[in-house]
């Protein structure tokens, strides 16, 4: 089996189970000759078991024959933190104004979820990375 020639990689963030060929997906795929409706249908099929609307990063590899493959990543840490704290958005002034509190259990749960995609060797290092993200969003982290 001959190896296909990779033309490009496209990185997108799409809502799980609710992706449509409308912007930003269509305009990102169109110039590379990839069928947006075909990608959307495959993406929605693979993400239908996830929470609807949860933002999922996806890396699409486009080949010379206009075919494609894609890899689903874990949701961004900021999205998981906002969901755990039940807040709409982070603080504009993260040092002075705190918008929520993240428990130890929630921190560990988020770290376990992010472990495959995060640059950490163990769960403790992952927890520190997630805690740093939370602090930069104005979320207080329980010690």
Curated annotation (Swiss-Prot):
<keyword id="KW-0687">Ribonucleoprotein</keyword>
<comment type="similarity">
    <text>Belongs to the universal ribosomal protein uL11 family.</text>
</comment>
<dbReference type="InterPro" id="IPR020783">
    <property type="entry name" value="Ribosomal_uL11_C"/>
</dbReference>
<dbReference type="InterPro" id="IPR036796">
    <property type="entry name" value="Ribosomal_uL11_N_sf"/>
</dbReference>
<dbReference type="Pfam" id="PF03946">
    <property type="entry name" value="Ribosomal_L11_N"/>
</dbReference>
<dbReference type="InterPro" id="IPR020784">
    <property type="entry name" value="Ribosomal_uL11_N"/>
</dbReference>
<dbReference type="GO" id="GO:0006412">
    <property type="term" value="P:translation"/>
</dbReference>
<dbReference type="GO" id="GO:0003735">
    <property type="term" value="F:structural constituent of ribosome"/>
</dbReference>
<dbReference type="InterPro" id="IPR006519">
    <property type="entry name" value="Ribosomal_uL11_bac-typ"/>
</dbReference>
<dbReference type="InterPro" id="IPR000911">
    <property type="entry name" value="Ribosomal_uL11"/>
</dbReference>
<keyword id="KW-0689">Ribosomal protein</keyword>
<comment type="function">
    <text>Forms part of the ribosomal stalk which helps the ribosome interact with GTP-bound translation factors.</text>
</comment>
<keyword id="KW-0488">Methylation</keyword>
<dbReference type="InterPro" id="IPR036769">
    <property type="entry name" value="Ribosomal_uL11_C_sf"/>
</dbReference>
<dbReference type="GO" id="GO:0070180">
    <property type="term" value="F:large ribosomal subunit rRNA binding"/>
</dbReference>
<dbReference type="Pfam" id="PF00298">
    <property type="entry name" value="Ribosomal_L11"/>
</dbReference>
<dbReference type="InterPro" id="IPR020785">
    <property type="entry name" value="Ribosomal_uL11_CS"/>
</dbReference>
<protein>
    <recommendedName>
        <fullName>Large ribosomal subunit protein uL11</fullName>
    </recommendedName>
</protein>
<comment type="subunit">
    <text>Part of the ribosomal stalk of the 50S ribosomal subunit. Interacts with L10 and the large rRNA to form the base of the stalk. L10 forms an elongated spine to which L12 dimers bind in a sequential fashion forming a multimeric L10(L12)X complex.</text>
</comment>
<keyword id="KW-0699">rRNA-binding</keyword>
<keyword id="KW-0694">RNA-binding</keyword>
<dbReference type="GO" id="GO:0022625">
    <property type="term" value="C:cytosolic large ribosomal subunit"/>
</dbReference>
